[in-house]
């Protein structure tokens, strides 16, 4: 009788083990996590009063995301993303723009910064303008907030 009970228990264990293995094999596999279709573009832009990034007091900060669509707390995300795409994300090209407008020669420095990721590449940029007038001329849309 002991042998029969042991054989039945062993048989039941084998059947249940086989069913559990089969059930696990039949379960659908979880899809592999893949990245998005677009390289990430997420930026934090700031404007601060001061002569350098290290000493400036941040007055305003906004977020800007350009992929897959323009969005963020920037007042004109579409315009800012369009301006950045036109220069392939080169912030120097934006801040070095020229204009026919004239500004006073006062020294009241403003520092603009951009930190984050532009089309998958890390960005850490800062530029010091002599005054607000020069900043508004040169930075057209991206730092105009």
From Swiss-Prot:
Localization in the cell: Secreted
Keywords assigned: Disulfide bond, Protease inhibitor, Secreted, Serine protease inhibitor, Signal
SUPFAM superfamilies attached to this UniProt entry: Subtilisin inhibitor (SSF55399)
Superkingdom to which the source organism belongs: Bacteria
Keyword Secreted included in the entry's annotation: yes
Primary location group: secreted
Site feature location: Reactive bond: 105-106
GO cellular component: extracellular region
Example GO molecular function: serine-type endopeptidase inhibitor activity
Record-annotated disulphide pairs: 66-81, 103-133
Pfam families the UniProt entry points to: SSI
Signal peptide: 1-25
Chain residues in the propeptide: 26-35
Database matches in InterPro entries: Prot_inh_I16_SSI (IPR000691), Prot_inh_SSI_I16_CS (IPR020054), Subtilisin_inhibitor (IPR023549), Subtilisin_inhibitor-like_sf (IPR036819)
Subunit structure: Homodimer.
Function: Strongly inhibits the kexin (KEX2) protease. Also active on subtilisin but not thermolysin, trypsin, or chymotrypsin.
Family of the protein in this entry: Belongs to the protease inhibitor I16 (SSI) family.
Protein name as catalogued: Kexstatin-1
Organism: Streptomyces platensis
Phylogenetic lineage: Bacteria, Bacillati, Actinomycetota, Actinomycetes, Kitasatosporales
